[in-house]
Amino acid sequence: LRLVTDAYEPGSVFKTLVAGAGFDLGVVRSSTSFEVPASIKVGDDTVTDADKRDYTMTMDVREMMRRSSNVGFVLVGRKIGADDFAAYVDKWGIGHSSGVDFPGESLGIVKERDQYDGATLGSMSFGQALSVSPIEIARAVGGIANGGVMMTPHFYKSSKGDEKDWGEGERAISEDAASQVTSCMQTVVSEGTGVGGAVDGYDVAGKTGTAERADENGGYLKENYMSSFMGFAPAQS
């Protein structure tokens, strides 16, 4: 199953985990506002938003999530700081086995804190400069849905009436932080980039991701993207 054995750059789906870290630390809340420029330097690179849209404005974190602003999340990442950012990447289980009961799980490529360069924090803040398996991201986002507690994923074929012991899970962020992320993700689906993920009769929380594909010769391929959506329902704000 490729969601276990393959790794990819998660792109903007990763912003949910960055927001969760910021909320948990208390350095930002969903209502915290930033003056967001049209572009920002990350190491030697200049980061813009998708299609070079100019989102120069005052934006709070909820609006950054709704618009999926790369530039905005670079600012959030800087607010968190490299040391805490790396610690929360670890707390989210990124770069570690999810524990799924299927062989061949890819751990992707995730830099340790002492491997960070001038571009790492900024790039990872919007889901580049790392690769992960979809099951890792699903486990982490499932933790948001579960009030901040991540569970070990399993392939479950059917129930024969026996009660299953799924364990207690592993807390990544506080329940309040998870609630804030969930609320932002609901806004993404109701009026943001994720409106296509809406389902009639369900309150859906979700986040879109559009990642540039890495070039085997270095850098990224132009006009070549990988799109994704990660969400859950019913959402509890």
Positions of PLM-derived features:
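Beta-lactam-recognizing serine transpeptidase/beta-lactamase-like catalytic domain environment
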Residues: 1-12, 17-237
